[in-house]
From Swiss-Prot:
The name this protein goes by in its record: Aspartate--tRNA(Asp/Asn) ligase
Gene Ontology molecular function: aspartate-tRNA ligase activity; aspartate-tRNA(Asn) ligase activity; ATP binding; nucleic acid binding
Annotated Polar residues bias: 593-606
Gene: aspS
Function summary: Aspartyl-tRNA synthetase with relaxed tRNA specificity since it is able to aspartylate not only its cognate tRNA(Asp) but also tRNA(Asn). Reaction proceeds in two steps: L-aspartate is first activated by ATP to form Asp-AMP and then transferred to the acceptor end of tRNA(Asp/Asn).
Site feature: Important for tRNA non-discrimination: H31, G81
Organism encoding this protein: Cutibacterium acnes (strain DSM 16379 / KPA171202) (Propionibacterium acnes)
Matching InterPro entries: Aa-tRNA-synt_II (IPR004364), aa-tRNA-synth_II (IPR006195), aa-tRNA-synth_II/BPL/LPL (IPR045864), Asp-tRNA-ligase_1 (IPR004524), Asp-tRNA-ligase_1_N (IPR047089), Asp/Asn-tRNA-synth_IIb (IPR002312), AspRS_core (IPR047090), GAD-like_sf (IPR004115)
Region (Disordered): 568-606
Keyword Cytoplasm belongs to the record: yes
Pfam family, one: tRNA_anti-codon
Length: 606
């Protein structure tokens, strides 16, 4: 063995023991013939003392930060007054008798120090150095503890950890696929899975009944600040269950995760319907750490002469103390709204005497001015922000304003936790609305799925969802923590006729459905059981548990917000030879039957 002990595990009880440690030089300090080194390994750090007789003979004078070294010595108590109560090893030091440099270090691109600010590009380019910083190291340790806790719960409930394919066929699931050329079938392509959705349903048909997987998923989306093209999710599926069964298991699993950080999750968690969440909070993932709910005032302004409020929906949210804001800050709110696609954010201020003032107040009636503060719950000194237009977009704008007000006015304690389930979301939404929000609409119909095409309608909607898609509800449930959607799932469709009806609403006809999803539809013919499941975003879960700023902090080797990897410089061009060999430009053969067949393409090569 290269070492006998881990540096961070030494305590006062080890005083007098001979030890051999190995790790990195964190800091070095020289004090008149004595050198002190903070020796760091994965367990923490210990102070190493190199005295005169060893200092000259060991080459310790040449040591620099991040040299990899091995030392042998004796654990001693630190001199009186030199103990460090902020360090687990702060009562001891190791007086060394031998020192060996295992590997020197080149000059560092940045200091391995929590207190030094480092740009993200540099951190990701030298990620192996960034991970030596304790905070980043702890992120991956926490991630390991979380997956261990998850497995313990699911193992207790007799779940099977089963892998599903990484190379599969491209199927429309709501995002763009990453495609991989199939060299042995020129012109044909694999797709990396957006989720294990279809395979886990097939596992339920196969009789496995209880499946889970910590699965890698891939989505070729337009990159956003806190998204990754590849990510990890906890994927769970169960047969012969209803919504309550899945939620109960999910709560037990999540409670085990929060227990890691010393938080007792109160179960059962509250449930709120999707429509209630939108009406009260302007979000389908509401932050329940504070109130300050939005208020609909459409009826209040039903007879208004103010043209802006002559809209299908008018809503309001109060900013406590907002009347004292200078005009430039109200102008900044307008710009804030425009960055979210709105024309602006109308507002009224309530003076200390309770009189409505501001641009909107000049355009509404005396009766409306007299009643608006009471209607929305505003007090003297408050400001009221309004949104008017389509219901969904207006509610979303007010919901975003509510969150911004909560942060600016410190309406909640950032260390608090608020959990809930959002249930009974719409099964479908208009395709134009989905595309306008940047989503990929599956199918060519006027309606597309809100969650995915395999979500079952609620039992009450089973007979009417295709004749009245706008009123149909999904048998689905989302796990929300502090305004973050951490997990989501649903009871699945298990009957071929129901699945075909859903496809039809989405504009996926019988031939297309059979071509793209025939393997699933055919499986449903063989006694597919009722089943449901859930998936949790593991990256986001660990980020929240550890209080990290982005999911990149909890991924070992993440990519930037635009999908670039500074460490390996990926993605990168391929050579012309690779392109030819992979068949990137090849066209698939047309079989005699007319329909393109992967199977026939592969048969022609064997």
């Amino acid at each position: 063995m290269l070492r006998t002990h881990d540096a961070g595990t030494l305590r006062a009880s080890d005083i007098g023991k001979g030890v051999t440690l190995a790790g990195w030089v964190g800091h070095r300090r020289d004090h008149g013939g004595v050198a002190f080194i903070d020796l760091r390994d994965a367990s923490g750090l210990a102070q190493v003392v190199i005295r005169d007789e060893i200092l000259e003979s060991s080459g310790a004078h040449d040591l620099r930060n991040e040299y990899c070294i091995r030392v042998t010595g004796v654990v001693e108590a630190r001199p009186e007054g030199n103990a460090n109560p902020n360090l687990p090893t702060g009562e001891i030091e190791v007086a060394i008798t031998e020192l060996e440099v295992l590997n020197p270090s080149a000059p560092l691109p940045f200091q391995i120090d929590e207190h030094v600010s480092v740009g993200e590009d540099a951190r990701l380019k030298y990620r192996y150095l960034d991970l030596r910083r304790p905070h980043q190291h702890e992120a991956l340790v926490l991630r390991s503890h979380v997956t261990h806790a998850i497995r313990e719960v699911l193992d207790r409930h007799n779940f099977y950890d089963i892998e599903t394919p990484t190379l599969t066929r491209s199927t429309p699931e709501g995002a763009r696929d990453f495609l991989v050329p199939a060299r042995l079938a020129p012109g044909c392509w694999y797709a990396l899975p957006q989720s294990p959705q279809l395979f886990k349903q097939l596992l339920m048909v196969s009789g496995m009944e209880r499946y889970y997987q910590i699965a890698r998923c891939y989505r070729d989306e337009d990159f956003r600040a806190d998204r990754q093209p590849e990510f990890t999710q906890l994927d769970v599926e169960m047969s012969f269950v209803d919504q309550d069964d899945v939620i109960a298991l999910a709560e037990e699993t999540m409670a085990a995760c929060w227990k890691i950080i010393g938080v007792d999750m109160p179960t059962p968690l509250p449930r709120i319907t999707w429509h209630e969440a939108m009406d009260r909070y302007g979000s389908d993932k509401p932050d329940l750490r504070f109130g300050n709910e939005i208020t609909e005032v459409t009826d209040f302004f039903a007879n208004t002469a103010f043209r802006v409020f002559q809209a299908p929906y008018v809503g309001a949210v109060v900013m406590p103390g907002g009347a004292s804001l200078p005009r430039r800050q109200f102008d900044a709110w307008q710009e804030w709204a425009r960055t979210r696609g709105a024309k602006g954010l109308a507002y009224i201020t309530i003076s200390d005497e309770g009189v409505p003032e501001g641009p909107v107040a000049k355009n509404i009636s005396e009766e409306e001015k007299a009643g608006i503060a009471e209607k929305v719950g505003a007090k003297p000194g408050d400001a009221i922000f309004f949104a008017a237009g389509s219901k969904t977009s207006s509610q979303e704008l007010l919901g975003a304003a509510r969150l911004e007000i909560g942060r600016r006015c410190e309406l909640f304690d950032p260390s608090d936790w608020a959990f809930c389930w959002v249930v009974d979301a719409p099964l479908f939404k208009p395709t134009k609305e989905a595309e306008a929000s940047g989503d990929v609409a599956v199918g060519t119909g006027a309606w597309t799925a809100v969650h995915h095409a395999f979500t079952s309608p609620t039992p009450d909607c089973l007979d009417t969802f295709d004749t009245d898609p706008g009123s149909a509800l999904a048998y689905a449930y989302d796990f929300v923590v502090n305004g973050n959607e951490v997990g989501g799932g649903s009871i699945r469709i298990h009957r071929r006729d129901v699945q075909e009806r859903v496809f039809n609403v989405m504009g996926i006809g019988p031939e297309e459905a059979q071509e793209k999803f025939g393997f699933l539809l055919d499986a449903f013919k063989f006694g597919a059981p009722p089943h449901g499941g859930i998936a949790f975003g593991l990256d986001r879960l660990v980020m929240l548990l550890g209080g990290f700023e982005t999911i990149r902090d909890v991924i070992a080797f993440p990519k930037t917000g635009n999908g670039y990897d500074p460490l390996t410089a990926a993605p990168a061009p391929i050579t012309p030879a690779q392109r030819r060999e992979a068949g990137v430009d090849a066209k698939p053969k047309e079989p005699s039957g007319g329909q393109t067949s992967n199977a026939e393409a592969y048969k022609s090569t064997t």
